[in-house]
Regions:
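C-terminal motif of bacterial Sec signal peptides marking the signal peptidase cleavage site
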Residues: 15-18
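Metal-centered catalytic cores of metalloenzymes
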Residues: 20-97, 101-193
Length: 193
């Protein structure tokens, strides 16, 4: 438990240090009503933050592991880019990490790559602690059932509780740790004007 909180705190600090934030954020409604049908969002829309806390118990079926992770996501002002940072600890022989579409307790298809940035898988042998992946997801990066669709379609799945991040390893090729993506605890959407 203590290790999970430390990893989460470090991940939040790392992500926040790399993000431009307005000096005095204004709390907005936690909704996607401002997201337009063309995949962008209106000029007065909020900057949105999401988080997934990953553990073996959330995998389907559950995996017994000491590995933990945190994925932090931030939507840009026009809703066309979703920046992310994926941090993990105590995990061995990583092969890949993704965003999948499915509710908690159900496995679903890959819709975006987090590590590496695309196929094929890349093995990191041995134990890994630190930032596994960071980058930006756009509509062009969506794969599987979201290929050719907009980032808004991914955000709709997040809003409905139907998106998760997970990390795959050689010993658990279906996924060793997983976490549903949701609005971040303690993080609020902020006005970007």
């Amino acid at each position: 438990m203590k290790t999970s909180l430390i990893v989460f705190a470090i991940a939040v600090l790392i992500f926040i240090s790399g993000c431009d934030q307005p000096a005095e954020p204004e709390i907005q409604n936690n909704s996607f009503e401002d997201i337009s049908k063309d995949g962008g969002i209106t000029s007065d829309a909020a900057l949105l933050n999401f988080v997934a806390v990953l553990s073996g118990l959330q995998e389907v079926p559950p995996v017994e592991t000491r590995a933990r992770g945190t994925a932090i996501f931030q939507l840009n002002a026009d809703g066309t880019e979703l920046s992310y940072k994926l941090v993990c600890a105590n995990i061995r022989n990583i092969t890949q990490a993704h965003i999948h579409i499915a509710p908690a307790g159900v496995n679903g298809p890959v819709v975006a790559w987090l590590y590496p940035s695309g196929p094929p898988s890349v093995l990191i042998p041995g134990i890994f602690n630190g930032v596994l992946g960071e980058g930006t997801i756009t509509a062009a990066n969506l794969v599987g059932p979201l290929a050719g669709l907009t980032l808004n379609d991914l955000l709709d799945a997040v809003k409905a509780g139907n998106a998760y991040a997970n990390i795959h390893t050689t010993q658990n090729p279906g996924g060793e740790i997983r976490g549903q993506i949701a609005f971040g605890n303690g993080m609020v959407p902020v006005n970007v004007e």
